[in-house]
Structure formats: C-alpha cells, structure tokens
From Swiss-Prot:
Function according to Swiss-Prot or TrEMBL: Co-chaperone involved in the maturation of iron-sulfur cluster-containing proteins. Seems to help targeting proteins to be folded toward HscA.
Lineage start: Bacteria, Pseudomonadati, Pseudomonadota, Gammaproteobacteria, Alteromonadales
Protein name, entry field: Co-chaperone protein HscB homolog
MF terms in GO: ATPase activator activity; protein-folding chaperone binding
CDD domains reported for this sequence: DnaJ
Signal peptide feature range: none
Record-linked Pfam families: HSCB_C
GO biological process: [2Fe-2S] cluster assembly; protein complex oligomerization; protein folding
Domain spans labelled J: 2-74
Amino acid sequence: MNYFELFKFSPAFDIDTALLAERYRELQRAVHPDKFANDTEQQKLLSVQRTAQVNDGFQTLKDPIRRAEHMLSLRGIELSHETTTVKDTGFLMQQMEWREALEDIRDSADPQASIDELYQSFAQYRAQLTQQLTQLLTSEQAEDALLAADQVRKLKFMAKLHDELTRVEDALLD
C-alpha cells in the first residue's frame, strides 16, 4: 500500500508533519469501527482493517527512517527486514570511534560533557546523512535509490547508537 497516496501526499522525504497529523485524524474519523457499529460484519471487518492501515501509514510517514524505507519499497527496494551491513569504510571508522567514545564515558572526568559531545557529533552526522538522503530520494535514477538505501542503513545504525547513548546517560543519572 502506498501511504503517501492514502494521506494525499506526493512521495517525498520531507513532508509537513502537522498536515500529516491533521489528515490522520480525518481518516480516523472516516474509518473508525464505532462508525460502523450497526453495519454488516463484513463492513465492520473492513473498518478494522482500514483503521489498521491508517495507523500503520501514519506511524510510517511520521518517522523519517520508516518514511525513507517506504519510499524505497515503492521503488522495489526492501530494507525493513534486511541484514545487509554498511560497506562505507569511512562510516565504519566513524562508527568505531563513536563506540570507543561511548565505552569511555563512564571513565571520563566529565561524563556529561562526553555525552553532550557525542550527541552533538551524532546530530551533525545525522543532518549530513538526511540532507544527502533527501537529494537521493528525489532522484529517479536506480543507482541513487541504492545509494539512498545505504544512507537509510546508516541512519538506522545511528538511531541504535543514539538509543545506547541515552541508556548510558540514564544509567549515569541513576
């Protein structure tokens, strides 16, 4: 299912999330199962299925990584359950540096400063990836779609690493 069509958006990485939320509420009102309480069982079932599609579509489009994965899936590139790893040597080196910095936080003289520095480094790198991804996803070239898939893989890794950093920060605050 094309969630962009469901929510009446052109397929694009950058979307108006406020408008997305508004359209979500409109769709929810239109397909909510309570609205079909007096209808046939088939209508009730269709309403439940449609509600699930609307919910899944909203969750997909509001999350940048899932939105990019959806855009790529519409082009025949499935990333959601893949195990392919990033082969970019520069990114792998950066990944190792971040992991080392993450491990060194507990022994740091100023753990919070180290955490803040890592958050800033993540934000800068993620902004670069997102900018590149936006450009690649607007292209119609098959090669650019494959490059976009690599950017999404990097963003997925960054999201996991960000979660790890948040856990380390929470543990230090306890």
